């Protein structure tokens, strides 16, 4: 018999069951076979999975197959009928490229810990260098970018005594650093970092499939891993750190060490702050930029007698330009914060996540005024850092909420939209070409979960790589549901989408307030 095919994109809830397309089911399965069990195999393993066929759905056994192959939302599975109810399954990623599997067998099919054995380095889990235990070489796996995390190889963790708590700093070749919190999976002891890995890869030009090498250059206190330059293949096994690090990297490492001393000696340093209690040092954290909010140290506010003040606060840069922000006090904790303008202030002054700044209170009467002080190594030791106040329990809880939210964002970045007749104006042009005033609603849970609002700049990316600019507007005064206005008509025409068809889109953030909705595939697929 000729090999027949059908393929399905994996949508939320796909673990429970997979629906066989109606046309394929009626033509090649219904009424033809007495048995109700399909046999599935893939190139990733010699094992054959038996999956129950319940009507038009694959049920019992399907979840085991999906988990064993580490299938994710957005992946595409292609079924080729080899004989009777025996199928060969080809597994594709969202980009329609084949998912790469290593030599690891998927025959050990425990649904929990063995899941990650299916793919080689599924989330960027790396391999230690046999010559230098302080180094490891890893591959940027698509899943590590998809879930914004990097796992450390167990050999490297064991040899260097790395634990799943505390902080770690990743430093590139030029000395720029990224801070992460170490985590550990209770079920199997895997140590990993999450949130910020995608930003690190983007900044250093690392893409899916690239290899990279890290070397542990500092063990005491906060761990520091340095990204080593890629070497020719014949030298790839010899991983070594130059005897003298680049000056920028060395200075950055010293900065990290100074920050540690601040954390270890909060009380002693706070006492010496009497030299200049009007100053404090703060860290520009990713969460402060995302939420446009800076928490002010309690000790600083209290010592200057302004811990009860509300209203407005003015920030002035070195050139005298000013920004007016809202000053508020959280009733639950008494923590002071400034918002609505902090992100603009940072952007205008070249401050990015991870930057260290010094602010000085130069006016207490009427509206409070903080001035940005130039960062100089000599002055940095004279101005006592109260950044640990900013990293108070309140901030830690805030960051933990952000971490959980990022995890949810990663899992909910796909959305399915249906081109309903309601969204199409009554006058249709030739062969489903739609009028210019067409719009498309976005699901409320999707926009809320991903922090999309009316100020978000959104672009639509079609299957040909062409971008269509659209505008987000609230549908009514309740300001709940957003609709895309403009660009939608050209976008659906470019993707050949007609009335009552559904498409799956992927959300990709480019900057803090700008994002792209990328066309993945049509949900309802026709058998060719």
Swiss-Prot record:
Top-level lineage group: Eukaryota
Chief subcellular location: nucleus
DNA-binding region coordinates: 3-95, 135-231, 279-376, 425-522
UniProt keywords, alphabetically: DNA-binding, Nucleus, Repeat, Transcription, Transcription regulation
One Gene Ontology term, aspect cellular component: nucleus
GO molecular function: sequence-specific DNA binding
Region: Disordered, residue numbers: 234-253
Localization in the cell: Nucleus
One GO term of the biological process aspect: embryo development ending in seed dormancy
PANTHER family: B3 DOMAIN-CONTAINING PROTEIN REM-LIKE 3-RELATED, TF-B3 DOMAIN-CONTAINING PROTEIN
Protein's UniProt name: Putative B3 domain-containing protein REM15
Species lineage: Eukaryota, Viridiplantae, Streptophyta, Embryophyta, Tracheophyta
């Amino acid at each position: 018999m000729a090999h027949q095919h059908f393929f399905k994109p994996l949508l939320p809830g796909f673990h429970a069951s997979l629906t066989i397309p109606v046309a394929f089911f009626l033509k090649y399965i219904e009424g033809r076979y007495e048995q109700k069990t399909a046999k599935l195999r893939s190139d990733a393993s010699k094992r054959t999975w038996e999956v129950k066929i319940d009507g038009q759905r694959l049920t019992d056994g399907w979840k085991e197959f999906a988990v064993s192959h580490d299938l994710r939302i957005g992946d595409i599975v292609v079924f080729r009928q080899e004989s009777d109810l025996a199928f060969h399954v080809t597994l594709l990623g969202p980009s329609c490229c084949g998912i790469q599997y290593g030599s690891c067998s998927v025959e050990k099919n425990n649904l929990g810990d063995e899941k990650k054995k299916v793919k080689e380095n599924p989330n960027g889990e790396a391999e230690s260098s046999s010559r230098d235990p302080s180094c490891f070489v890893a591959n940027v796996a698509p899943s590590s970018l998809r879930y914004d995390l990097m796992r450390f190889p167990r050999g490297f963790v064991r040899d260097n005594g790395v634990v799943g708590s505390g902080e770690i700093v990743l430093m590139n070749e030029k000395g720029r650093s990224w801070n992460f919190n170490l985590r550990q999976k209770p079920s199997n002891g895997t140590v990993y970092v999450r949130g910020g890995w995608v930003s690190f890869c983007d900044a250093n030009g690392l893409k899916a499939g690239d290899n990279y090498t890290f070397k542990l250059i500092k063990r005491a206190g906060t761990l520091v891993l340095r990204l080593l330059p890629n070497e020719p293949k014949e030298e790839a096994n010899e991983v070594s750190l130059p005897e003298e690090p680049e000056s920028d990297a060395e200075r950055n490492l010293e900065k990290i060490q100074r920050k540690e001393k601040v954390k270890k000696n909060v009380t002693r340093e706070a006492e010496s702050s009497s030299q200049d209690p009007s100053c404090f040092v703060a860290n520009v954290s990713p969460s402060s930029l995302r939420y446009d909010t800076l928490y002010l140290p309690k000790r600083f506010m209290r010592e200057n007698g302004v811990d009860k003040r509300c209203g407005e606060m003015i920030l002035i840069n070195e050139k005298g330009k000013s920004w007016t922000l809202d000053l508020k006090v959280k009733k639950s904790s008494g923590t002071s914060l400034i918002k609505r303008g902090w992100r603009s202030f940072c952007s205008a002054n070249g401050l990015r996540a991870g930057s260290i700044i010094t602010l000085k209170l130069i006016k207490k009467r009427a509206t409070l005024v903080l001035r940005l002080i130039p960062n100089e190594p000599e002055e940095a030791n004279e101005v006592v850092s109260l950044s640990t106040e900013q990293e108070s329990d309140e901030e830690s809880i805030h960051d933990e909420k952000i971490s959980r939210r990022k995890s949810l964002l990663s899992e909910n970045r796909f959305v399915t939209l249906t081109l309903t007749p309601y969204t199409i104006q009554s006058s249709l042009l030739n062969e489903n070409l739609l009028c210019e005033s067409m719009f498309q609603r976005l699901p409320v849970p999707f926009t809320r979960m991903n922090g999309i609002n009316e100020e978000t700049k959104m672009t639509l990316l079609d299957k040909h790589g062409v971008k269509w600019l659209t505008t987000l507007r609230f549908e009514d005064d309740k300001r709940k549901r957003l609709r895309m206005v403009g660009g939608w008509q050209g976008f659906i025409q470019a993707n050949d989408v007609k009335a009552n068809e559904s498409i799956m889109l992927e959300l990709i953030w480019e900057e803090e307030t700008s994002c792209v909705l990328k066309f993945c595939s049509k949900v309802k697929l026709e058998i060719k």
